[in-house]
Amino acid sequence: WTLREVLRTRLRLLAPFVPFMANELHEQLTGEPAEDADWPEPDPAREDDRTEIEERLVERLTDDVNDIVDVTGTDPDTIRVYVAADWKRDVFDAVREHGPDRGAIMGAVMDDPDLRERGDEVNQLVGDLVEFVRERPDEELDALTSVDEGAVYEDASEFLAREFDAEIEVYAEDADPEDPADKAGDAVPFRPAIHLE
């Protein structure tokens, strides 16, 4: 069904540029010429904010790797992607819950003894995440809270491997990853650390 819908839509969109071929193919596919078919419109039932967010995360990761490759002039054999530790995600959740009020956020996160031990590191992360949250609409932030970032990059690893002709390894920062360049600690929620080798 999906392939049929994609073909029907593409043929209709091609009709102004290659009318004869598009009409013939559209008629074979649907029984009516492309010129008589309605112009395709987006179907709101098929729109999914979470899927679009996940796609943007992969796109941003791809852009970041391309930037690193361009700057360093390397052709990596292995690309390691480090996803932020769970405690950083907890800080993101606190920022999301308390809004841009750093005092309220710090009060909430410092109630957690594990986060209190990380004092300065948490303070720096809160500043970065407050900026991140301010730049995004609530709908996007709502979708981000339900995203499993590690799973997104794992699912995209085949695409990334083809894109960069390299082996892709995805690690969680707090899962004792292979980290020869000590990059894992640089990961923040929705902005993974990257190491090329």
List the predicted regions and their residue ranges.
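Acidic, turn-prone loop/beta-hairpin segments
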Residues: W1-D63, Y82
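Short glycine-rich, basic-tinged beta-strand/loop micro-motifs
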Residues: L3, T72-V95, G127, E131-A143
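Active-site lining segments that contact anionic ligands and/or coordinate catalytic metals
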Residues: R8, G31, T74-R80, D165, ...
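Ordered core of a single globular domain
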Residues: L11, R50, T62-T78, A85-R102
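C-terminal, active-site-flanking charged/polar segments
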Residues: T30-G31, G99-V109
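Short, solvent-exposed polar/charged micro-motifs at secondary-structure junctions
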Residues: D43-D48, R89-D93, D179-K183
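Ordered, soluble secondary-structure elements with a strong preference for glycine-centered loop motifs
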Residues: D48, E52-R56, F92-A94, S146-G150, ...
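C-terminal edge-of-domain segments
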Residues: G107-E197
